[in-house]
Swiss-Prot record:
PANTHER family linked to this entry: CORONIN, CORONIN-6
Origin organism lineage: Eukaryota, Metazoa, Chordata, Craniata, Vertebrata
Source organism of the structure: Mus musculus
Keywords: Coiled coil, Repeat, WD repeat
Name of the featured protein: Coronin-6
Residues covered by region (Disordered): 410-433
UniProt cross-references to SMART domains, sorted A to Z: DUF1899, DUF1900, WD40
Segments of skewed composition (Low complexity): 419-429
Record field: transmembrane: none
Statement: the UniProt record of this protein carries the keyword Repeat: yes
WD repeats, residue ranges: 79-119, 129-169, 173-212, 216-259, 264-304
């Protein structure tokens, strides 16, 4: 009698759990715009969500610790004249976020560590180059201030956000609307999917298609694709019978998928969130109430189903926390921020362990906030892997880094030359922009206090009159 061999994996028992009710973010009017993006972006400091707003597009930015009910007058980030379609935090500065809009522009914003008293309306820079709506944003994983945008004009533009210049424009590769764009780990290649049902690998600096596969999935619904850590590709799509699929591809041989998993029948496009440290891909569909996750390995069958986290409410969007924002003391290997119609709910993925010690096997060194290259170095042909950090002592986000406006680079946040001596907050020079912003905030607070004092005085007088009248 043969014995069934159980596959050995430290991720066989990954469990998902929704955070407690008091850890959710309540009373948020999540955007109802029809667009297949995540509508949510998160980093170790902030949570950003695209919201409903009159008179243009807007998104809300909350400190992670600001859970509970969000005041209806909480300041928004506004400035777009059309709906916001995508947002993405800069991986090298936790206070910088980019937004893309139906109004054809991309805006880059500096988010202060303190809570502003009014809407943030002035971006650091507005990037204008698309002729139709912009629905996709993606920062370069290793080069400072390099941002990619893709629009309804079938064009991909790669910007140097620090100078506002167009580094590259890929305008003759895609014959139809682009559905997704993803960098590989060192930012040397792009993987794109398009309405023409073709999966492409592109060298952006040569404006060349390195490899392509027509109809990787036979269905008519949109595709998505992401690179794996070893350079393979994961794609999500639909079969001819509308079954949702996950496929693994070797770019050196696009004839047949290395592995193919078929799932349920549904209309929701599956958004893949890939973690290179664990080689787990999480699949989240808009309108679904579940998250499926699979482990990708180098031995057959290559794609291994792990589990499904299910809940009652369908998701309107999803945010995925970078590894450096996780709680390693709780063996947390992933954290999602699930958007409901009126709230955002954290979902935590853990690997149960008996020991309280740091689990080295769960937490290899992971990309940190330091860029490996400058924009001009990358453009000249240099490549570099991400600068890694250890999570053993628990990641602590760096203090707020102010954008210094210079002719060369408006997002120049290069750290001091000597890392051994840190400059205290009292020694750090304030830019003119920061000083003016703080003075405006102080004036607004004074005006508010004065108005409240006048209101209190008026109410006290009314109370005295009422008391006198009853005597």
């Amino acid at each position: 009698m043969s014995r069934r061999v159980v596959r050995q994996s430290k991720f066989r028992h990954v469990f998902g759990q929704a955070a407690k009710a008091d850890q959710a973010y309540e009373d948020i009017r999540v955007s109802k715009v029809t667009w297949d993006s995540a509508f949510c972006a998160v980093n170790p400091k902030f949570l950003a969500i695209i919201v409903e707003a009159g008179g243009g597009g807007a998104f809300i930015v909350l400190p992670l610790a600001k859970t509970g009910r969000v005041d209806k007058n909480y300041p928004l980030v506004t400035g777009h004249t059309g709906p916001v379609l995508d947002i993405d935090w800069c991986p090298h500065n936790d206070n910088v976020i980019a937004s893309a809009s139906d109004d054809t522009t991309v805006m880059v914003w500096q988010i202060p560590d303190y809570t502003p008293v009014r809407n943030i309306t002035e971006p650091v820079i507005t990037l204008e180059g698309h002729s139709k709506r912009v629905g996709i944003l993606s920062w370069h994983p290793t080069a400072r201030n390099v941002l990619l945008s893709a629009g309804g004009d079938n064009v991909i533009i790669i910007w140097n956000v620090g100078t506002g210049e167009v580094l590259l424009s890929l305008d003759d590769i895609h014959p139809d609307v682009i559905h997704s764009v993803c960098w590989n780990s060192n930012g040397s290649l792009l993987a794109t999917t398009c309405k023409d049902k073709t999966l492409r690998i592109i060298d952006p600096r040569k404006s060349q298609v390195v490899a392509e596969r027509a109809r990787p999935h036979e269905g008519a619904r949109p595709l998505r694709a992401v690179f794996t850590a070893d350079g393979k590709l994961l794609s999500t799509g639909f079969s001819r019978m509308s079954e949702r699929q996950l496929a693994l591809w070797d770019p050196n041989n696009f004839e047949e998928p290395v592995a193919l998993q078929e799932m349920d029948t549904s209309n929701g496009v599956l958004l893949p969130f890939y973690d290179p440290d664990s080689s787990i891909v999480y699949l989240c569909g808009k309108g679904d109430s579940s998250i499926r996750y699979f482990e990708i390995t180098e031995e057959p069958p290559f794609v291994h189903y792990l589990n499904t986290f299910s809940s009652k409410e369908p998701q309107r969007g999803m945010g995925f926390m970078p590894k450096r924002g996780l709680d390693v003391s709780k063996c947390e290997i992933a954290r999602f921020y699930k958007l409901h119609e009126r709230k955002c709910e954290p979902i935590i993925m853990t690997v149960p362990r008996k020991s309280d010690l740091f689990q080295d096997d769960l937490y290899p060194d992971t990309p940190g906030p330091e860029p490996a290259l400058e924009a001009d170095e990358w453009l000249s042909g240099q490549d570099a892997e991400p600068v890694l950090i250890s999570l053993k002592e628990g990641y602590v986000p760096p203090k707020h880094r102010e954008l210094r406006v210079t002719k060369r680079n408006i997002l120049d946040v290069r750290p001091p030359a000597s890392p051994r001596r840190s400059q205290s907050a009292s020694e750090a020079p304030l830019s003119q922009h920061t000083l003016e912003t703080l003075l405006e905030e102080i004036k607004a607070l004074r005006d508010r206090v004065q108005a409240q004092e006048e209101r209190i005085t008026a109410l006290e007088n009314m109370l005295c009159e009422l008391v006198d009248g009853t005597d």
